[in-house]
Amino acid sequence: MSAIKKGITLVALSLAGCVSQSPQFAVPDVIRFGQDTFVKVTHSQIDEMQHLLYLPEKSEKNPENWQKGILFFLDKNSKNQTLEQRAAFRQASFAKKPELEAKVEIQQNELHSSVIYPPTERFNNVMLEVTRGRNLACGYGQIQFADKREVGKTLAKKSPNLTAYSQEIAKLSLELNQLGWQVQCSK
């Protein structure tokens, strides 16, 4: 009987070791992007999802009111979603919002998107957002850069021509693609 207990204990310990050895996300505390240095301001987690916000070092670092930011979305991906599934979901979501300009594609095993959001009643700015995402050993990691561009209240109500921002979003997308990959997995 004691041999059975020892065997069960050994199996339980080895399984516990496997669980504790699963890879975890590792991200930097500071990111250099464009002309700015961004520092981690918030880190929240809900179930398997983590959300981190980095704001320029030379800013108020107010997570409720910022103009430029880098966001990380980290998902353990227990549902094993492919990049194609994530791309289809985004395209379907963006299709429901005809007022924005969006592009989603997969390039070299990365999910890329660029979105131009129009001003709203609450926010009088146009937001340019570019993202890169990868499936990793520890889950799905996504890096997003968002830049809010002020527009006057009068222009915000007139629904500005978002295609006027096409060159700027293409430039931001190129800069984000040139940024070294920032999400790693560690044990």
Each language-model region and where it sits:
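Sec/Tat-exported extracytoplasmic proteins
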Residues: 42, 94-98, 173-176, 180
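N-terminal export/targeting and maturation segments
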Residues: 23-66
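Bacterial signal peptide processing site
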Residues: 19-21
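Short, well-structured beta-strand
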Residues: 115-187
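Conserved polar/disulfide-associated segments of primarily extracytoplasmic proteins
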Residues: 58-123
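Sec-dependent signal peptide recognition
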Residues: 2-10
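Short, exposed beta-strand/loop patches in secreted or surface proteins that constitute
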Residues: 30, 43, 100-106, 133
